[in-house]
């Protein structure tokens, strides 16, 4: 179920969490190309105040754990307005151009602080 909330005036931190499933996760050429593209995004994007990039952790199997994704990328923005700017930023668009052909699925979870 999708919950839509009016967050236009949100001023607190905005967390943008992105999960990627690569088409060929065992193909070294593909994983290297994806990692190169996302690392370029991390290095060059001016909007994020913090970043985290990694692979699915190999943890014990539990019903609540989904580690089927190939890569995870999280960016923290100062607010919603900054995240909106990121969506049209040339660094983000270049990443999509360079890497979109490598993934078969992407899921984004965005969150805002309830304390704002």
Predicted regions and their residues:
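"Short basic amphipathic alpha-helical interaction patches in structured regions
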Residues: 87-89
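Short S/T/G/P-rich N-terminal loop/turn motif that feeds into the first structured element of a domain
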Residues: 1-74, 78-85, 112-116
